[in-house]
Structure formats: structure tokens, C-alpha cells
């Protein structure tokens, strides 16, 4: 810690490092140990880009202006629906290729996207093999059409389908095809692979493949290693991060602030405190000043280590060197201290946040509320919940989940159910964690009928129907 005194006042706030704000990561995880997929949905973010559609050209038709772009999209969606209907007829003896040819649809990147997304939406455990085959069959058919060339996004979307189907070898073959067709693999390509293959225990093989790749387009990162490290951190491959870092040094690449932040954070998560501070010293010796994210890692370490005084000293040091702590740093402290059960210290830093002119945001309030709930102090959590709404901070799905869990722990199921309705009326859609928290607690309390009412309501609204089996002993009637 003494080496911190030698830091210069330069603060390099790097946008690419924003994932290192660990208090924000709090709102991406399950709260209170609910066993679910962290309660988060991971919608595929595929953007449609077409230079031909950068502008909208309106024309007069039947006395009304109709957007050419809008008509194109509506026509494409209709074509996609026809394609999906045709693909569903695929079976032995049915010539799918000829049937698709007879549709005479206009092939475009948007059509490919609509069809593949349509397949992805219908994918289930029972039909995953069929979905993978249909997606690839359609993909190949499109690629064979005159004057059409797949985009990198189309490849990534098909990779996503293969990933959901557990077709790891098919994913790797698709990447080979992608490279053969002249497409550079990107950080997005790697991220899709590592997210899937990491779960299958193939992460190191994938990393080695990309390290050796000559077609890996790692921009906007400084070098390929930073792109790889960034993706590994996103899937919590902390041990592999250390290995990649050593490989990077052996290959003669120099780390930068982003590199150090990632490796330090990984070592923090692995509980390797000594190595964390050795890396910090290396960073300073290499002439790099710690940025806001570096300080956030250190604050998180001190907070989870139950060292509020040392954390306070670090905050003061930050001010001395010209780095003004923000709400994110105070939130990190509150989060770490609440996990250590130090609720009084949490309240102190919450008040300190306001004193220094920072406005606690929804994440800060949610961390504080969750701390109170975990500590069995429901009344204080309710007061904090009321305070945040009065100050214009609208509760998010994680805030509501904490409060619902708190009411359930206190046996106040009527209030918990009322809060579920309140969040829906406010336009805050419950995620699966919220439903499972309420349903499982109701069942554990012997309130089976009430639990089934919640599930029934969830199903009627079309929410998470594919995850019903994860709710304890639930059977659809």
C-alpha cells in the first residue's frame, strides 16, 4: 500500500475498462444465493447495417408517405416467416433447397438475421439438434445465392445457435469457414467462443488458437492479448488470465493500464493478495499511473477484507493526488463491507457519499438495501427503499428482488406479492430471479396455492415459460 503514495496525478480513464467497476457487476449476479442463471437474460445484440438504408426515402403512395425502409423491413419479416415455415417441413424425402428456391425471396443480411433469430427463439432441449441443422442448411443455401455474401454478424449469429445447441465442433468448423471466406475473426468472435467453450472445459484450447491466429482483428484493443484478457474476465476465467498474461510477456508484448487492471482484478478474485500488490508495483515501475478502475479494485479488496480504515485512507489519498472518488467507488466500498457484515460502516460511507457531493444512484441504494436484507434488518431496508424513491431513484429489478426476498424471509408474503405487482405496474419487468425467489419461498412456507398463482401469472404473460422446470417441483397443469 505504501507504493500508492508515489502515484502521479494523471488519471487515465479508459472506456474499455468499464467492466472493472465491480459494484456494477453486483447487479449482474444473483442476490442472496438464489440458484438461477444469475437472473439475467443475454439477448443477442446483432446490429443491422446497410449502406443502402442509411437514409429514409419517402415516396407518395395512395396519398400517404410510406417509408421505403419500413416497407423493406416488413417485407423481409414476411419473407422470413415463409422461410421458417418451409424449414419446418424439412424431413427425409423433402427437398429443402428446392423448396427455398421456389419461395423466390430476396436474400439480404436482414433476412438471414430474421430467420436465424426465429430459429433461436424456438430452440429447446428437445429440438436443439434439429435447430442447428436447419440453421446451417439455411445459412449454406443463402451463401450459394448469386450476389449475396454473408456478413460477420451472420456468422456470429449462427455461432450463437451452435453454442446454444452444444455443437462445439461445428462452431470451430464455422470459424475455419469464416477465415477461409476472408473474414477476420474479431473480439466478438472470440467472446462467443470462450463463453461457450469455457463452460465445456475447452477454454485454453480456444485461447491458444486465437493467440496463434494471424487473422484475429483485435481492435480496438492495443494487441490481441488485451482482447483475449478482456473476454476471459467477462466469463470469469481468472486462472486462465494469469496464464495468458505470462504468455504475453514471453511473446514480448508490453502490458498497459488495461492489462494490469484485468490481471489485478483476476488475482483479487482468486484471493492472491500478494500477487495483486506485486502487479501494482510492476505497473508503477513501468511508468503507468493507476486510474479510477485500479483504485476501485483496491477499494473492493480493502472492503471485502474488512479494512474500512485503510479504505478511508485510500479515499483520502485519491483526493490528495487529484483523483476525486465518485459514487462508483463509494458503492464498491459499501458492497464489500456489506458482504463482510459491517452495516454500520456501510451507512457511514453512504452518508459520506452525500457529504462529498455525490448523489447515490440506484446501484448504490440497491447494494445498501441488499446489505440490510442479508443482515436481517428489513425495517432499515424499507426506509432506504422509501428514501430512494423519494429522491427520484427508481428501483430496478435487482432492488425489487432484494425487497421481495426480505419480505419472504420475514414471512410477509402478502407484501412480497404486492411488491411484484407494484414493479410490474411501474414498467419494471420481473426477471426469472424475482419469480423464483417468490415462488420458492412461498413453497417453502407451505403456501403452494399462492406459489402456483404466481407461476400461472408468469406463464399467462409469456415470461420465462422455458424455465418453468427450474421452479421447485412445479408441473404444468
Curated annotation (Swiss-Prot):
Under InterPro entries, the record lists:
Pentatricopeptide_rpt, PPR_P_subfamily, TPR-like_helical_dom_sf
Query: What Pfam families does this protein map onto?
Result: PPR_1 (PF12854), PPR_2 (PF13041), PPR_3 (PF13812)
Q: Which PROSITE patterns match?
A: PPR
Query: Matching NCBIfam families, A to Z?
Result: PPR
PPR repeat ranges are 151-185, 186-220, 221-255, 256-290, 291-325, 326-360, 361-395, 396-430, 431-465
* Coiled-coil region(s): none
Q: Does the keyword rRNA processing apply?
A: no
Q: Which UniProt keywords apply?
A: Repeat
Alphabetized PANTHER family for the sequence: MITOCHONDRIAL GROUP I INTRON SPLICING FACTOR CCM1 (PTHR46128), PENTACOTRIPEPTIDE-REPEAT REGION OF PRORP DOMAIN-CONTAINING PROTEIN (PTHR46128:SF211)
Source organism superkingdom: Eukaryota
Query: What family is it from?
Result: Belongs to the PPR family. P subfamily.
Give the signal peptide as a residue range, or say none if absent. none
Give the lineage. Eukaryota, Viridiplantae, Streptophyta, Embryophyta, Tracheophyta
Please identify the protein, giving its name as recorded.
Pentatricopeptide repeat-containing protein At1g55630
Amino acid at each position: 500500500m505504501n507504493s500508492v503514495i508515489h502515484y502521479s496525478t494523471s488519471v487515465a480513464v479508459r472506456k474499455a475498462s468499464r467492466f472493472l467497476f465491480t459494484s456494477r457487476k453486483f447487479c449482474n449476479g444473483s442476490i442472496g444465493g438464489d440458484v438461477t442463471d444469475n437472473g439475467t437474460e443475454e439477448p443477442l445484440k446483432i446490429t443491422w447495417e446497410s449502406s443502402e438504408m442509411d437514409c429514409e426515402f419517402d415516396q407518395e403512395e395512395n396519398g400517404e408517405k410510406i417509408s421505403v425502409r419500413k416497407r423493406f423491413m416488413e417485407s423481409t419479416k414476411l419473407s422470413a416467416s415463409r422461410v421458417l415455415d418451409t424449414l419446418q417441413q424439412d424431413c427425409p424425402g423433402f427437398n429443402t433447397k428446392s423448396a427455398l428456391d421456389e419461395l423466390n425471396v430476396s436474400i439480404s443480411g436482414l433476412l438471414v438475421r430474421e430467420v436465424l433469430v426465429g430459429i433461436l427463439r424456438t430452440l429447446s432441449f428437445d429440438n436443439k439438434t434439429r435447430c442447428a441443422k436447419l440453421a446451417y442448411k439455411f445459412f449454406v443455401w443463402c451463401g450459394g445465392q448469386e450476389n449475396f455474401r454473408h456478413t460477420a454478424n451472420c456468422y456470429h449469429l449462427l455461432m450463437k445457435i451452435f453454442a446454444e445447441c452444444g455443437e462445439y465442433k461445428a462452431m470451430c468448423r464455422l470459424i475455419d469457414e469464416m477465415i477461409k471466406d476472408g473474414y477476420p475473426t474479431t473480439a466478438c468472435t472470440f467472446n462467443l467462443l470462450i463463453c461457450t467453450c469455457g463452460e465445456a472445459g475447452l477454454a485454453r484450447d480456444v485461447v491458444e488458437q486465437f493467440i496463434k491466429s494471424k487473422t484475429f482483428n483485435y481492435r480496438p484493443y492495443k494487441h490481441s492479448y488485451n482482447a483475449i484478457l478482456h473476454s476471459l474476465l467477462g466469463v470469469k476465467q481468472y486462472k486462465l488470465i494469469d496464464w495468458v498474461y505470462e504468455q504475453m510477456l514471453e511473446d514480448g508484448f508490453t502490458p498497459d493500464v488495461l492489462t494490469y487492471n484485468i490481471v489485478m482484478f483476476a488475482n483479487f478474485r482468486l484471493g492472491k493478495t500478494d500477487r495483486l500488490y506485486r502487479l501494482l508495483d510492476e505497473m508503477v515501475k513501468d511508468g503507468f499511473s493507476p486510474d479510477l478502475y485500479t483504485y476501485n479494485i483496491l477499494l473492493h479488496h480493502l472492503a471485502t477484507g474488512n479494512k474500512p480504515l485503510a479504505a478511508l485512507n485510500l479515499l483520502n489519498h485519491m483526493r490528495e493526488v487529484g483523483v476525486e472518488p465518485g459514487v462508483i467507488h463509494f458503492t464498491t466500498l459499501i458492497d464489500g463491507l456489506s458482504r463482510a457484515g459491517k452495516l454500520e460502516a456501510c451507512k457511514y460511507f453512504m452518508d459520506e457519499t452525500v457529504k462529498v457531493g455525490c448523489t447515490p444512484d440506484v446501484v448504490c441504494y440497491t447494494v445498501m438495501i441488499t446489505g440490510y436484507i442479508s443482515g436481517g434488518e428489513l425495517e432499515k431496508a424499507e426506509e432506504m427503499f422509501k428514501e430512494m424513491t423519494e429522491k427520484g431513484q427508481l428501483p430496478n429489478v435487482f432492488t425489487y428482488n432484494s425487497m421481495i426476498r426480505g419480505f419472504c424471509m420475514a414471512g410477509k408474503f402478502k407484501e412480497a406479492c404486492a411488491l411484484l405487482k407494484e414493479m410490474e405496474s411501474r414498467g419494471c419487468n420481473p426477471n426469472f430471479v424475482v419469480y423464483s425467489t417468490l415462488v420458492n419461498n412461498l413453497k417453502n412456507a407451505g403456501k403452494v396455492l399462492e406459489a402456483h398463482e404466481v407461476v400461472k401469472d408468469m406463464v399467462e404473460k409469456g415470461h420465462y415459460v422455458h424455465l418453468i422446470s427450474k421452479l421447485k417441483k412445479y408441473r404444468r397443469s
